[in-house]
UniProtKB/Swiss-Prot annotation:
Pfam families: PG_binding_1 (PF01471). It catalyses: Catalyzes the rearrangement of -S-S- bonds in proteins. SUPFAM superfamilies: DnaJ/Hsp40 cysteine-rich domain, PGBD-like. Residues 1-40 form a transit peptide. This is Protein disulfide isomerase pTAC5, chloroplastic. One of its GO terms (biological process) is chloroplast organization. Exhibits zinc-dependent disulfide isomerase activity. Required for seedling and chloroplast development under heat stress, probably by maintaining plastid-encoded RNA polymerase (PEP)-dependent transcription.
Length: 387
């Protein structure tokens, strides 16, 4: 770049030479007054350095432009791929719609064809049976052929109906996780299902349909009977298993009731032991199913649960002396189970410690009497179930 000049006018005020206050120490030369009033300034910057700087800036702009061009090309490619996917999906949807329409149109046609064939068969059978024609109208070969065609049409209709059923979405029952603090109809159904299996949740919990300490204790006892983790939380898998077990128990009760009604000339067989009758309740599942429950049970205060009536049936039957010599006597203490529920932790496996002392023990501390199992080995039969 060429050097630039900038004229500057600096008007210096000229004081009078004949000042009385201060005099110049030298003599004024006539050249001193010949200095022009405008001064020319020349640039001292290096033009090569400026040119190099501008070249660097231009290269940086070119690189930025190339980067934006690459980004734009990438966006264009992504847009084209998305448009291609959309077009492919639209084609698939159209093909599926056409296929469904063809299936829907073919089913009524096949049904009408089958109805027409059946009508023709009936008419021909009537004509042959009436004897109006001299020769039989339907030969055996043609009859077999028509029957085969009808069977094939029926198979096609069945296959088409199965395809339509498979295409329909299957609605599955979703159960929410139940734990301490839950409330509502799900908790009530859980409590009634546990009650039917012999696990009592407590009067207060069942009255307000709340998942509190009584329900948690019943759930833990039921989990201990299954051999799963005793955390007092009912997951979807455990709820499904609970209601399946409940259905099995209902089927067993119905079968035993049928056998009792058929035994002894229609007289119902009852045990000599008198047990209070439990009121009839209704177990409601989320699938709106209702099962009538009527059982004779005894509530065990020590174990906080209802006794299973199947264990009470047959206790007072006459014992055959000949058979008693060969068979072993079942343990009375554990009722032939070989184990007893731990009375210190009520079958939960957790230590029975007051809340103010829980800070002194660890979180994973288990009941020292049953070692967290919830039950102890029967000390009468040593777990052998028989004496």
């Amino acid at each position: 770049m060429a050097s630039s000049s900038l004229p500057l006018s600096l008007p210096f005020p000229l004081r009078s030479l004949t000042s009385t206050t201060r005099s110049l120490p030298f003599q004024c030369s006539p050249l001193f007054f010949s200095i022009p009033s405008s001064i020319v300034c020349f640039s001292t910057q290096n033009p090569d350095r400026e040119e190099v700087r501008w070249l660097r800036e231009e290269q940086r702009w070119i690189r930025e432009e190339q980067r934006w061009i690459r980004e734009e090309q990438r966006w264009i490619r992504e847009r084209e791929s998305l448009l291609q996917e959309i077009s492919d999906l639209q084609l698939r949807i159209q093909s599926l719609e056409s296929r469904n329409s063809q299936l829907g149109n073919s089913i009524p046609d096949t049904i009408s064809n089958i109805a027409a064939l059946l009508q023709v068969l009936k008419e021909k059978n009537r004509i042959s049976e009436s004897g109006l024609s001299a020769t039989p109208m339907v030969l055996e070969s043609t009859r077999e052929q028509i029957v085969e065609e009808v069977e094939e049409e029926e198979k096609r209709v069945i296959i088409a109906e199965e395809k339509v059923r498979v295409s329909e979405p299957v609605k599955k029952i979703k159960r929410r996780i139940l734990k301490v603090g839950s409330e509502g109809d799900d908790v009530q159904a859980l409590q009634e299902a546990l009650l039917k299996l012999g696990f009592y949740s407590g009067e207060e919990d069942m009255e307000f349909s709340s998942f509190s300490s009584g329900t948690a204790s019943a759930v833990k006892t039921w989990q201990a009977s299954l051999g799963v983790r005793e955390d007092g939380v009912m997951t979807a898998e455990l709820l499904q298993r609970l209601f399946m077990d409940e259905d099995v128990e209902t089927d067993k009760d119905e079968a035993s009731t049928m056998k009792k009604e058929e035994a002894g000339n229609g007289a119902v067989f009852t045990s000599v032991t008198q047990v209070p009758e439990k009121k009839q309740s209704i177990v409601k599942d989320q699938s709106d199913r209702e099962v009538d429950v009527t059982q004779n049970r005894v509530f065990l205060l020590g174990e906080n649960r209802w006794e299973d009536p199947s264990r009470l049936i047959g206790r007072n039957k006459p014992v055959d002396r000949s058979e008693s010599t060969n068979t072993k006597t079942r343990c009375i203490t554990c009722r032939g189970e070989g184990r007893l529920m731990c009375l210190e932790c009520d079958g939960t496996g957790e230590p029975n410690i007051e809340p103010q002392f829980m800070e002194w023990v660890g979180e994973d501390t288990k009941c020292p009497y049953c070692e967290g199992l919830g039950y102890t080995v029967c000390d009468v039969c040593d777990g052998k179930k028989n004496l």
